[in-house]
Curated annotation (Swiss-Prot):
Gene responsible for this protein: mnmA
A Pfam family assignment: tRNA_Me_trans
Annotated region (Interaction with tRNA), positions in chain: 146-148, 308-309
Record site feature (Interaction with tRNA), residues: H125, Q341
Known catalytic reactions: S-sulfanyl-L-cysteinyl-[protein] + uridine(34) in tRNA + AH2 + ATP = 2-thiouridine(34) in tRNA + L-cysteinyl-[protein] + A + AMP + diphosphate + H(+)
Protein name: tRNA-specific 2-thiouridylase MnmA
Native species: Nitrosomonas eutropha (strain DSM 101675 / C91 / Nm57)
Disulfide bonds: C100-C196
Gene3D superfamilies linked: Adenine nucleotide alpha hydrolases-like domains, HUPs, Translation factors
Gene Ontology molecular function terms on file: ATP binding; tRNA binding; tRNA-uridine 2-sulfurtransferase activity
Length: 361
């Protein structure tokens, strides 16, 4: 029997529940831990943390494992949410899930688990950890449609050395099948979507409570005024919905897309047509780099990159590499490259790391 102690982050969802189940079957001393990362407006209408905790508790009872609830909302506000607001205020579109993983789920949670005497932590992420000669690699999850390595690229060697991903080798359908077979009550529970602290709440309504609104003009690239925006923070590159632009006399009937923002003049730029050249970029610049091995990848080697979750891998090369910034060139132009989002670099199934997109050409 393997009596190593592992603390499993249990969200109330099927993935983390099956992760706990598998570890228990493998003989680990399993402790469940439910993380509460957000306090404000935790109402039934928009946020389901109370229901999620009850689901996690129900599974813990069935598995006969202890479940602890811990509140990381102060850490979340300081390390994740404050940066989220600052990025939006600067006109960028951040991905808080990336920071939540590196700062909360694999830092605050890991520290707490170690204080409980844990040897390992585990989560229900679709990813895998391999150790080769004392180096820990982060690999894509086996289920390509659910792979979550994109959100985990900021993890370091110390974090990965303590991490188990029990369902990383499984497909989602297999996870649900295991949950159903063992009578877990959340076997058919819907996957959570959206940003964790916003829940199902309308995004503009949420952001408007924290940042001042500054409406302005919407321009075409040749300077024609075609509408008014509600505040640059509400829009992201490539956005089509919610622009409120009607038909232009003698103009094209193709849909409008956001192509850029000018924070100095408070102008939102739009173009018509999904394949407009202004929406395509052949290279990007990234900063705040994080490399899983601790060392940067080779310049000029052919790698693959994702500039958004679930994107098909795009062949690329690192054409300039400095201490904390790099330029990445693509074999084919990429659509909707968005400042504030993460670019993540892969070598086959191995996630090497990445950075935050700052610019593109």
């Amino acid at each position: 029997m393997n009596k190593s102690r592992v603390v499993v982050g249990m969200s109330g969802g099927v993935d983390s529940s099956v992760a706990a189940l598998l570890l228990k079957q493998q003989g680990y001393d399993v402790i469940g831990l439910f993380m509460k990362n957000w306090e404000d407006d935790d109402t039934d209408e928009y946020c389901s943390s109370r229901k999620d905790f009850l689901d996690a508790a129900s599974v813990a009872d069935i598995l006969d494992i202890p479940l602890e609830a811990v509140n990381f909302s102060a850490e979340y506000r300081e390390r994740v949410f404050s940066l989220f607001l600052a990025e939006y205020q600067a006109g960028r579109t951040p991905n808080p899930d990336v920071l939540c993983n590196s700062e909360i789920k694999f830092k605050a949670f890991l520290d707490h688990a170690l204080a409980l005497g844990a040897d390992w932590i585990a989560t229900g992420h679709y990813a895998q950890v391999h150790e080769i000669n004392g180096q820990f690699q982060l690999l894509k999850g086996e289920d390509g449609n659910k792979d979550q390595s994109y959100f985990l690229y900021r993890l370091n060697q110390q974090q990965l050395s303590r991490t188990i991903f029990p369902i990383g080798h499984l497909y989602k359908r297999e996870v649900r099948k295991i949950a159903h077979k063992h009578g877990l009550p959340n076997s058919t529970k819907k996957d959570s979507t959206g940003i964790c602290f916003i829940g199902e709440r309308p995004f503009r309504e949420f952001l408007n409570r924290y940042l001042p609104v500054d409406p302005g003009e919407i321009h075409t690239l040749d300077g024609q005024i075609v509408g008014e925006h509600q505040g640059l923070m509400y829009y992201t590159i490539g956005q089509r919905q919610g622009l409120g632009i009607g038909g232009i006399r003698e103009g094209s009937e193709q849909p409008w897309f956001v192509s850029g923002k000018d924070m100095q003049t408070n102008v939102l730029y739009v173009v018509q047509g999904h394949d407009h050249p202004a929406l395509l970029r052949s290279s990007l610049t990234a900063a705040d780099l994080s490399w899983i091995s601790g060392a940067p990848p080779h310049q000029s080697w052919v790698y693959a990159a994702k500039i958004r979750y679930r994107q098909t891998d795009a062949p690329c090369a690192i054409i300039r590499l400095e201490h904390d910034s790099c330029q990445i060139g693509f074999a084919a132009p990429q659509w909707g490259v968005t400042p504030g989002q993460s670019v993540v670099i892969y070598e086959s199934k191995v996630c090497l790391g990445g950075g935050i997109i700052t610019d593109s050409v």
